């Protein structure tokens, strides 16, 4: 199961595009709200969540995805349950993926230290001790995937498919 964590103010395309590509690849993917059945993004688009945060089960998790959108990122940061979940997931070897502004969360938690990563350009300095690849659209290093910005949502989503199901699966989704 892939869990996409949504907090109020998330960037809609950064949640929807990767979710769509993951589902096209046959990966069970759930949109997860911090609370309540719906979550509104930074541009006023409201999504229906499949689950609430309390229903995330790391025993069946392949990956946790953190979309950007500064409001959503700050809401994720402010929720101690999210920090605990991410730390536990990292300890269990669950893939962690973050796009645009969201990699700063992984940086704040020290999870990118010594790893290659990217993020929204004005956030590069907030990636902890990561080796920043400023021109990269999507980067995987260990069990971490980071993405550049909203415009790289497709590249990021395809990278998620690639790390979970292989290059052939990513090519197949790209060719749909």
Predicted features and spans:
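Active-site-adjacent pocket-lining segments in enzyme domains
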Residues: 1-10, 23-34, 51-52, 56-176
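Glycine-rich, flexible N-terminal cofactor/catalytic loop recognition
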Residues: 14
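Histidine-anchored nucleotide/phosphate-binding helix
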Residues: 19
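Membrane-interfacial amphipathic helices and adjacent loop/beta segments
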Residues: 31-32, 37-43
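Short gly/ser/thr-rich secondary-structure transition/capping motifs
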Residues: 43-52
């Amino acid at each position: 199961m892939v869990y996409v964590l949504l907090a109020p103010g998330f960037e809609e395309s950064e949640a929807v595009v990767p979710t769509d590509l993951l589902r096209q690849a046959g990966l069970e993917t759930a949109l997860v709200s911090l609370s309540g059945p719906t979550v509104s993004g930074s541009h006023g688009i409201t999504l229906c969540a499949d689950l609430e945060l309390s229903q995330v089960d790391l025993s069946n998790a392949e990956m946790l995805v953190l979309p950007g959108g500064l409001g959503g990122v700050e809401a994720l940061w402010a929720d101690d349950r999210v920090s605990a979940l991410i730390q536990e997931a990292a300890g269990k070897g669950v893939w962690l993926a973050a796009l645009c502004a969201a990699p700063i969360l992984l940086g704040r938690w020290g999870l990118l230290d010594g790893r290659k990563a990217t993020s929204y350009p004005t956030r590069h300095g907030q990636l902890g001790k990561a080796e920043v690849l400023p021109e990269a659209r999507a980067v995987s290093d260990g069990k971490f995937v980071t993405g550049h910005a909203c415009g790289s949502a497709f590249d990021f989503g395809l990278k998620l498919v690639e790390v979970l199901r292989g290059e052939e699966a990513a090519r197949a989704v790209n060719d749909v």
